[in-house]
């Protein structure tokens, strides 16, 4: 089974992708070693945080809240906005180079007036005051610890509505990171370049060929189904330092693409760079039933995950997904993969079940 191991990270349960137990014992040991290295890397990070608490409580940690100030806020429409926060003290650890695409992670933001916290998935972006543009962080740059978020205001969303009304410079409290999903560790793997995100279109194809040929392990592909602000989970994997090495077949549903604001051009650049196969569905133009029918027609059958294999080639055209991740409102998750019960994944249903996917290769994100 793909879902075999559970890891408790603070109050969260994460799952790891791993190969079928039918493989050889050598392969099993190879995978287990990789998992241990991954856990070791994250544990080292958490240990660093815990042991430094008494000396420095300014570094981001899952065990206590750290103060950040709102450094930029931009309305996309009446419901969606971008938020950038800056720590009061520069962060010593580059969270993006530490987590890479081996971990999907989030942080908790506290609403002190009603004493609730809400999880948000950060993106490696920063606001450039000179150009007034949103920029993708480059390798080695953590912008001193800035975190950027794409947020929607809901009527019953206490934290989002509170954040939207706060002025620039207001102090908020954040803790984390909390790992929401953990991919296999790739020992000694080289970083995947992000140069294509900063290059002219005419140079992207050549750059992809060069950097792909340097992989140590054979990349694997995944499918992601997102709706609304759930798009941030896919963008974190695609934009983080040392991003996802395979191809992501991304199905995204929104009322209209305008709700994505400056994130939409980034998605187009990722698509032009063969990082993602993008399919966007707008409910302004199609009914929910028509959207689901269109999605079902494009769902690829699941392929077995074969573990860490030596690199042979990259095929950006014939995607062979070994995993499906689903993130969005409850009704969307239920339609795509069956209902999720808080920390319990629940049985796989919906469109994915009809196309041969099951609990071995589907994971529902909150």
From Swiss-Prot:
PROSITE patterns: FAD_FR
Membrane topology: Peripheral membrane protein
Keyword DNA damage: no
Domain FAD-binding FR-type: residue ranges: 63-184
Keyword Ubl conjugation among record annotations: no
Main enzyme class: oxidoreductase
Any further remark recorded for this protein: Present with 2730 molecules/cell in log phase SD medium.
Protein name as catalogued: Cytochrome c mitochondrial import factor CYC2
Native species: Saccharomyces cerevisiae (strain ATCC 204508 / S288c) (Baker's yeast)
